Amino acid sequence: MKQIEVVAAIIRDEEGCVFATQRGYGEWKDWWEFPGGKMEAGETPEEALKREIREELSTEISVDEFLCTVDYDYPQFHLTMHCYLCSLMTDSLHLNEHEAAKWLSKDELGNVKWLPADVKVVEVIKSKIQ
């Protein structure tokens, strides 16, 4: 089975809400996920996260701490997703690749249709984040 390794940014604001994005393309169109993407050869997870967030959201983040790694078997591939708690370094965000986005409080995390791998991250967030 094909293996894909990605990083995901769990971007939090001052109120503890997390930033979620809705896919606008492909088989999983309209499902929600945490922004991020594939690591390139020679990149650290932190470098990959900063690059992906610049590409997807036209903003800068600080990578604050490792949260969890999720392994999930999709029908076509095995996904390994390394998730990091992050903060915005600027106030501007622009959706370059997603059709929608929203800030979700801990209580609102169940209100969107998450991609299967991201469901596991939501469970970790609910249990670990105050």
Description of each model-found segment:
Residues 56-63:
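Short secondary-structure junctions
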Residues 17-55:
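Conserved Nudix-box catalytic region and its N-terminal flanking loop in Nudix hydrolases
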Residues 85, 94-125:
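NUDIX/MutT-family hydrolases
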Residues 1-2, 126-130:
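Generic C-terminal helix-cap and adjacent flexible tail
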Residues 1-18, 38:
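Conserved N-terminal beta-strand and adjoining loop/helix that marks the start
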Residues 13, 60, 70-92, 102:
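Active-site-adjacent beta-strand/loop module that shapes the phosphate/pyrophosphate-binding cleft
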Residues 12, 45-54, 66, 84, ...:
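Hydrophobic packing within well-folded, soluble alpha/beta domains
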